[in-house]
Amino acid sequence: MAAVQRLLRASASGGAAAAAAAARRRMSTAVAPEQTPAAAAFPFAAAAGRARQRVAEERNVQWVFLGCPGVGKGTYASRLSRLLGVPHIATGDLVRDELASSGPLSVQLAEIVNQGKLVSDEIIINLLSKRLKKGEEQGESGFILDGFPRTVKQAEILDGVTDIDMVVNLKLREDVLVEKCLGRRICGQCGKNFNLACIDVKGENGLPPIYMAPLLPPNNCMSKLITRADDTEEVVRNRLQIYNDMSQPVEGFYRQQGKLLEFDLPGGIPESWPKLLHVLNLEDQEEMKLATA
């Protein structure tokens, strides 16, 4: 459990700096490949190539999904998790599980979430380390992280304990994000997520039109739907503002490493999923899975 131990040490006082220094030492000893015009135009191309090779050889990719609250990180990360056979680790789920457990952090977390604030580095690292330890004990290999890192400090800590192959940054215009978040519902019985919003936004001011069909629940879930406590317009807009203020340094951190893939969602799952697979060069992987299903 060396990786988790290093993660815990890094989260202690002064640990972030040590982790960042270790990451810089690794980077300084690597010889940067000569960039082709295509690689210069698309900084994520080299990272995508390395990640695709890792998929082909070992099926244990180590990816990160970034994006505003409600953009769909969990949806696309979980789909890729099933496609590639690696665990999907969502820090939002870790927080909600802790809230439901009535554990020592539950009261503190409830106050933070209900106010629309971001959970602190210390708490997130504590929850993530527990999840990594559990996965290692179960023999898991690789991961897709969803919702972590949110700060450069977290990115430095993560860089100090493991290699990230690629970072996918999902993007969606804010007016659509707000409407999407306000339509979210959870079945209080089965725990599945749904969305009642039917989004049909016209293109204007250079922005493309976006259509997202509602993700409706089956009849047996309809009467059991609940709204998350943090899905009010005031809280949603506050969370988006906080995220936007904090996300740019993290995006810059991974952009500088040539690992950041910016992906603008063109619509709902039917429109976005095939295009995401195309960008990741995973269409063949999807076809093979469907053929053997």
Swiss-Prot record:
The positions annotated for binding ATP are 70-75, 184, 193-194
**Keyword Disulfide bond assigned:** no
Kindly give the PROSITE patterns that the UniProt entry links to this protein: ADENYLATE_KINASE
Region feature LID, mapped onto this chain: 183-231
Tell me which residues bind AMP: 91, 96, 117-119, 147-150, 154, 228, 239
Q: Could you list the residue ranges that cross the membrane?
A: none
* Region feature (NMP): 90-119
Q: What is the extent of the transit peptide?
A: 1-26
- GO BP of this protein: amino acid biosynthetic process; root development; shoot system development
Q: What class of enzyme is it?
A: transferase
Q: Which InterPro entries match?
A: Adenyl_kin_sub, Adenylat/UMP-CMP_kin, Adenylat_kinase_CS, P-loop_NTPase
Concerning Pfam families, the annotation shows: ADK
Protein's cellular compartments: Mitochondrion
GO terms for cellular component = chloroplast stroma; cytoplasm; mitochondrion
* Family stated for the protein in its record: Belongs to the adenylate kinase family.
Summary of the function given for this chain in its UniProt record: Catalyzes the reversible transfer of the terminal phosphate group between ATP and AMP. Plays an important role in cellular energy homeostasis and in adenine nucleotide metabolism.
- Please name the PANTHER family in this protein's record: NUCLEOTIDE KINASE
| HAMAP family for this protein | Adenylate_kinase_Adk
NCBIfam families associated with the record: adk (TIGR01351)
Q: Can you name this protein?
A: Probable adenylate kinase 1, chloroplastic
